[in-house]
Regions:
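P-loop NTPase Walker A phosphate-binding motif
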Residues: 57-89, 339
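Conserved Walker B catalytic segment
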Residues: 131-192, 197-205
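Short glycine-rich substrate-engagement loop in P-loop NTPases that contacts/grips substrate
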Residues: 97-101, 118-140
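Conserved small helical "lid"/interfacial subdomain of P-loop NTPases
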Residues: 212-246
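Walker A/P-loop-proximal flanking segment of P-loop NTPase domains
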Residues: 1-61, 69-74
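Conserved NTP-binding/hydrolysis module of P-loop NTPases
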Residues: 94-121, 228
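A short beta-strand-to-loop transition that corresponds to the Sensor-1 phosphate-sensing loop
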Residues: 72, 157, 187-193, 215, ...
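Winged-helix-like regulatory helical subdomains adjacent to P-loop NTPase cores
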Residues: 2, 250-333, 337-345, 350-363, ...
Length: 392
């Protein structure tokens, strides 16, 4: 694959929301069931009363951002819906949103961007408020009612957003979403949202959950075919040959990546190259490209969780709680509690044994490879070389 193609895949990976709507739709090859489930609900909903709000959950790279963008574009392009329903697609990272008020301010700004004639005055009015979230929502609500319109807000990294809101703001947002039909929320999160599972939290059992599971063999083939089409006719022929003649190579990569689409896209070139000598060189290049994804994944963790992940990743093979505690010098109870959270964040898998001493392993093996290549010794890197030979 030429450099420009590699670059285009890179953009698709990390800047999905900046891609042209038609290009994104053309490359939308997986997560179709999840898309149809939510899209049909949006289509049939009149929002005469408060509608169901969704939370899309999945590990980083599972396809949440692409799915949210696809839904937002579809609302905007639907002739019937777009007359009264305005899609508000927030950026994957919204560093300017620090409170519920700034959340409403950002929505007012996006409304003004999409329809300056109707909503510029709204944005100006909200901008002049003194940090009052209640007044900000009241203004937005009134302007929407006056224009006989409603909004559907697509929020990636909803968990990060919730962390910045205090308890009062959580309660206020819950009240708005529960009682006001002018707004609907479709969120995404790369970790299980504690607010949804905490019985004492305002958002307990509030969202309809959509879990993005690892893609299966058929979906893997669809993704590879889509990538090949974007690359060229020769790539289409090559990938079809591999699917027919070497399905085991594709299955090995799927298991290695735990079926995470973003990582599979990055490994596309290695799959195409097969048993050529350049395979290991491509692996090194791919390791470098996965750094933004995996470093972000590590940054999401607490200090104790990072230490536990480090111990398991450096070991490669599964470890017991006792072994992890010895390596990290953390109390066994602390390790056990953090392992539960790491499983909820899809970082670690539990391997049950016949005893109480269960084993724990890094769930996505390619993440473990990245960790060894980035932080391991020469011996660790030789392990990766052997693995590459195995894939060939």
């Amino acid at each position: 694959m030429e450099n420009n193609n590699t670059k285009s895949h890179s953009v698709l990976l990390y800047n999905t929301q900046n891609i042209d709507a038609q290009l994104l739709k053309a490359g939308f090859s997986i997560r179709k069931k999840e898309y149809q489930r939510i899209w049909k609900d949006i289509q049939k909903g009149s929002m005469a009363k408060p509608e169901t709000h969704y939370l899309i959950q999945g590990v980083r790279g599972a396809g949440k951002t692409t799915l949210l963008s696809r839904l937002a574009y579809e609302v905007a392009e639907d002739k019937k819906l777009s007359k009264w329903l305005i899609p508000i697609l927030l950026n994957e990272e919204e560093y300017g949103i620090l409170s519920l008020f700034t959340f409403w301010l950002r929505i007012a700004e996006k409304l003004a961007e999409q329809d300056a004639k109707r909503y510029t005055e709204l944005f100006e009015q909200v901008s002049k408020l003194n940090e009052s979230a209640e007044m900000a929502w009241e203004l937005i609500q009134n302007h929407l009612d006056n224009n006989q319109q409603k909004i559907i807000v697509f929020v990636d990294n909803l968990g990060e957003l919730f962390k910045d809101f205090d308890e009062i703001e959580h309660a206020q947002l819950r009240e708005v979403l529960s009682l006001h039909p002018q707004i609907r929320l479709i969120g995404g999160s790369s970790q299980l949202l504690e607010a949804h599972f905490d019985g004492a939290a305002p958002f307990y059992q509030f969202f309809k959950l959509v879990n993005l599971k690892p893609i299966n063999e058929a979906e893997m083939h669809e993704l590879l075919r889509s990538l090949a089409k974007q690359t060229g006719e020769e790539a289409v022929k090559t990938i079809e040959e591999i699917i027919i003649e070497h399905p085991e190579r594709i299955e090995a990569v799927r298991r290695l990546t735990d079926g995470v689409p973003r990582t599979i896209v990055l490994l596309f070139q290695i799959i195409m190259e097969g048993a050529k000598e350049s395979s290991y060189a491509y692996l090194e290049e791919t390791i470098d490209k996965t750094t933004p994804l995996y470093k972000h994944r590590m940054d999401d963790l607490s200090r104790q969780q990072k230490a536990i992940v480090h111990a398991i990743a450096m070991n490669w093979d599964a470890m017991s709680t006792k072994e992890i505690a010895e390596q990290t010098r953390l109390p066994s109870k602390t390790v056990s509690a953090q392992l539960v959270k790491l499983q909820q964040q899809w970082i670690v898998d539990k391997i049950e044994t016949n005893t109480k001493n269960h084993l724990y392993i890094i769930r996505e093996r390619f993440f473990n490879i990245w960790y060894l290549m980035r932080y391991g010794s020469q011996t660790d890197k030789r392990r990766v070389l052997w693995l590459t030979r195995f894939l060939e």
